[in-house]
Every structure is written in structure tokens, then in C-alpha cells.
């Protein structure tokens, strides 16, 4: 993990309380400008007119379908789903390309480990600056480790605890996807030991999938 080919961004902007804080701010600005945020709604149709998306329909959490005119549509859904839900004169070539796209699903396991060295400064940004560590071992399911302490110290309440975000690539509905939280945590801890990230004596405080 501490080889010569380390890639580490020296400077970047990151919300004090995590990425979710940015979207909370966005939501507040939308509301202040008179916008309405529909939670639990599912877009089921996008109407293409003269190569422009002008109308969408979505189903609210109560089951009611709503149609909305739009000047601008910003989509964050996978392109395959976006084109599958489009109606109107959509070029066949674009539908074909979108249908052929493959996506990976991801399970993120939050793991808190008691790490007394953090409190006395032995383990710090100076000697361990990594925020993300990519694991490239074909025998290991774990793909990436996020060290939340190094993203922002305000994300961690206790100075003697190390919070990790462990990312596992899988496919929705497969064996790994269907693991229980306890089973997933057991694999996460086992693989951290295999790659030498933690020793056997480390205490796991809690975990959350």
C-alpha cells in the first residue's frame, strides 16, 4: 500500500460532513426557489419531441401518475434505463448502444475499527494520507477501501476509531448481493486481514451495510 506508484490528490474540495451535505444544500436551494422535491417517485416515461425531452411522467409514492412539462431534464439514471423509458422518435442506433451497456452493482460496507494509535497521532494524514485504496488482487472480492477519517475528521466522532467504507462489486440479486449484513461484515474483516490492512487483534466496534 505504500509503494512508489502511489497516486494521491494533494488538494480538493470536500463537504465537511460528507458528500450527502452537498445534496442537502442543493435541496435547500431548490426549495427556496419554489421547487418541489418528490421523494419515493419513479420516472416511467420521457417524451422525446424534435430531439428534445419536453415532458416526463412519474409515479408518486402514493401510486398516482403525474405528467410534467420541462424546459430542462437532468437524468442520473443508467443510460440503458433512460433510453428504455423514452417515447417518440428515438434513433434505433442510440437504443441499441444503450441496451448493450453493462453496469456493475456495488455493496458498500461501513466498518468501524478501534484504533488507539489515532488518538496519539501515530496514525495520521502525515504518515498515512490515503483516502481511497484500490485492491487489485484476483483472489480478493474487496475492490476499494475508503478511509473516512482522511476525507474529513468531522465524519468520525471518536478519535480512537477508524471508519472505513469497503466497496464490493457484484450483480444485483447474486450470492454476494443477497448476503446478510453480518455475513458481509465477516467477509470484509477477513479480507482486510488477508491483505494486511488490519491485524487479528483489532476490535470491530460496529458495521453497517
Language model regions located:
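A glycine-rich dinucleotide-binding beta-alpha-beta segment and adjacent secondary-structure elements
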Residues: 198-209
Amino acid at each position: 500500500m505504500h509503494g512508489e506508484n502511489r497516486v494521491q490528490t494533494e488538494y480538493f474540495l470536500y463537504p465537511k460532513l460528507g458528500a450527502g451535505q452537498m445534496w442537502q444544500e442543493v435541496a435547500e436551494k431548490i426549495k427556496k426557489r419554489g421547487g418541489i422535491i418528490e421523494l419515493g417517485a419513479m420516472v416511467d416515461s420521457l417524451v422525446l419531441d424534435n430531439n428534445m425531452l419536453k415532458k416526463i411522467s412519474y409515479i408518486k409514492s402514493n401510486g398516482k401518475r403525474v405528467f410534467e412539462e420541462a424546459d430542462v431534464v437532468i437524468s442520473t439514471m443508467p443510460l440503458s434505463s433512460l433510453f428504455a423509458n423514452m417515447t417518440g422518435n428515438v434513433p434505433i442506433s442510440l437504443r441499441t448502444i444503450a441496451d448493450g451497456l453493462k453496469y456493475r452493482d456495488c455493496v458498500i460496507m461501513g466498518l468501524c475499527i478501534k484504533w488507539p494509535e489515532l488518538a496519539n497521532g501515530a496514525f495520521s494524514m502525515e504518515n498515512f494520507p490515503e483516502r481511497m485504496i484500490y485492491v487489485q488482487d484476483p483472489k480478493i472480492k474487496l475492490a476499494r477501501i475508503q478511509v473516512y477519517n482522511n476525507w474529513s475528521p468531522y465524519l468520525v466522532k471518536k478519535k480512537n476509531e477508524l471508519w472505513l467504507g469497503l466497496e464490493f462489486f457484484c450483480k444485483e440479486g447474486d450470492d454476494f448481493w443477497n448476503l446478510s449484513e453480518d455475513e458481509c461484515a465477516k467477509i470484509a474483516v477477513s479480507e482486510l486481514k488477508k491483505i494486511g490492512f488490519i491485524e487479528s487483534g483489532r476490535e470491530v466496534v460496529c458495521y453497517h451495510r
